[in-house]
Each structure stands twice: as C-alpha cells, then as structure tokens.
Curated annotation (Swiss-Prot):
It catalyses: fluoride(in) = fluoride(out). It comes from Hydrogenobaculum sp. (strain Y04AAS1). GO terms for cellular component: plasma membrane. The chain crosses the membrane at residues 4-24, 33-53, 66-86, 95-115. It comes from the Bacteria. The keyword Cell membrane applies. Fluoride-specific ion channel. Important for reducing fluoride concentration in the cell, thus reducing its toxicity. One of its GO terms (molecular function) is metal ion binding. One of its GO terms (biological process) is cellular detoxification of fluoride. It is found in: Cell inner membrane. The gene is fluC. Signal peptide: none annotated. This is Fluoride-specific ion channel FluC. Keywords: Cell inner membrane, Cell membrane, Ion channel, Ion transport, Membrane, Metal-binding, Sodium, Transmembrane, Transmembrane helix, Transport. Belongs to the fluoride channel Fluc/FEX (TC 1.A.43) family.
Length: 122
C-alpha cells in the first residue's frame, strides 16, 4: 500500500508541476519562474504538511507518504532548478542566475518556516 501511495502521489505531483510550469512560462518566457514558483510553493507545502499531518491531525503514514514523499517528491524540481541555474550562468545571464538561485533558496527557507508556523496554528 505504501508503494502505491508514493506512486500515485508522485504521478499527480509531476503532472501538477508540468501544468503549473507551462502556464507560468507563457507569461514569463525568459526566466525560469515556473520552476521557482514550484520549488518555493513546494517548500511551503512541505513545511505546512510536516507539522499539520503529524502534530495537528496525526495522519496515517500512508497519507504522509502520498502527500509528502509522493506528491511533493513529484512536484518539486530541485534537479531542474540546478540545471536551469547553470544554464543561465552558461548563457552569461549572471544577474538572472543570481536572482534565481538566491531568490529560490531564500524564499524556499522562508516558505518552509511559514508553512510550519501556519501548520501549527490549525
């Protein structure tokens, strides 16, 4: 059952990542904003769910596997983030690379903290 939870969650997470990314890239084609939004919202969600599912509602392990390991594992894109960051550097877009790399990390840390805080309020 645990394997199925991770499989289903990962598939749905990957699909949502793809849909969000192509939607955002239509509006901001020259900056990897889609990946940045996905990684930062994923950071928020993992912070929120890590508290909410364990301390607020005490969700069963298979639900935690479905949402955190599965969905968020498929949804977040750290490997894509690093590849796109290197691509910006290789193209000589150093300022964009700086904003992208630093912005994703700073916002990611802040969103994990915010998610944990809000998850604890419920």
């Amino acid at each position: 059952m645990n394997y199925l939870a991770v499989l289903v969650g990962g598939g749905v997470g990957a699909l949502v990542r793809y849909l969000v990314s192509i939607f955002i890239q239509k509006f901001v084609p020259n900056f990897p904003l889609g990946t940045m939004v996905i990684n930062t919202t994923g950071a928020f969600l993992i912070g929120f769910l890590s508290i909410y599912l364990t301390e607020v509602i005490d969700a069963p392990p298979n639900i935690r596997l479905l949402l955190i390991t599965g969905f968020l594992g498929g949804y977040t894109t750290f490997s894509t983030f690093t590849l796109e960051g290197i691509g910006l550097i290789n193209n000589g877009d150093y300022l964009k690379a700086f904003y992208y790399i630093v912005g994703t990390n700073v916002i990611g840390f802040l969103f994990v903290a915010l998610g944990r805080f809000l998850g604890g309020l419920l």
